[in-house]
Amino acid sequence: VIKHSKNRKNISDFSLNDVWSENKILKKDFKKLHGFFWLFTLDLNSSKKDVQNTLLKWFKKYHNYNAYSWEIDLLSKRIISWISNTKITYEGSDEIYKNEFDYLIKKQVNHLINEIDRSEKIDDKIIGCAAIILAGVSFNDKTKFLNYGLSLLKRIINNTFDRNGFPKSRNLRQLTLFLKYFILIREWLKESQNDIPEYLDEIIYHLGQAYNLISKDSAATFLFNGCLLYTSDAADDET
């Protein structure tokens, strides 16, 4: 889900002056930039000031809804990235910055809650669900985020998997994606000392069994429905 680069980069290695410029960039690059998963590639010894200044520029320019930078998948990844990297995105900042950071996290989560049921993309739903739950365990005053996230998680599981715990789509890439995010959610709940729902443990078990079975053939594997050839290595590289 979250790739950690073996060769960590320092924030000072990047040119940040025009990072949020209006210059046209490819949609793929735009999504990578605004999803903020690049934060996971940074050395934690990077300058907190530089990282936070970069976020502050984003705060000022994109704090209101924008159809492009507030897409569900970008919004979800951004929430996960900001919260997961608080050592460089939050710690050591002044109260004004912290208040703005907290406000924008909550604003984005509220928007996500209002929009996620309208999305027809199951990938967006699970990433969004994970982001809502992470916000819920990160803010003491936002148990409603956690409660909503867990309720959404249960609905996703009920609607997406068959009685044996297999994705109804029979898609290996989705199996891998769900397994990774479910494990992340369980770890966040455990670390925050929240109860782990039995249904989450059960689906992780079933998906893990399926993944282990399929991964034994590391060269190539057909999807469960036999329609397409898909490599397990490629699945690992997806998200």
Report residues per predicted region:
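Metal-ion/cofactor- or nucleotide/acyl-coenzyme-handling active-site neighborhoods
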Residues: 210
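N-terminal leader/propeptide and maturation segments of large enzyme subunits in energy/redox metabolism
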Residues: 218, 222-229
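Anionic-ligand-binding alpha/beta catalytic cores of soluble enzymes and soluble regulatory domains
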Residues: 213
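Aromatic-lined, polymer-binding surfaces characteristic
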Residues: 26-204
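Long, low-complexity, highly charged intrinsically disordered regions
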Residues: 12-23, 27
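Single conserved hydrophobic/aromatic residue that forms the stacking wall/gate
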Residues: 230-239
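Extreme N-terminal leader/anchor segments
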Residues: 1-13
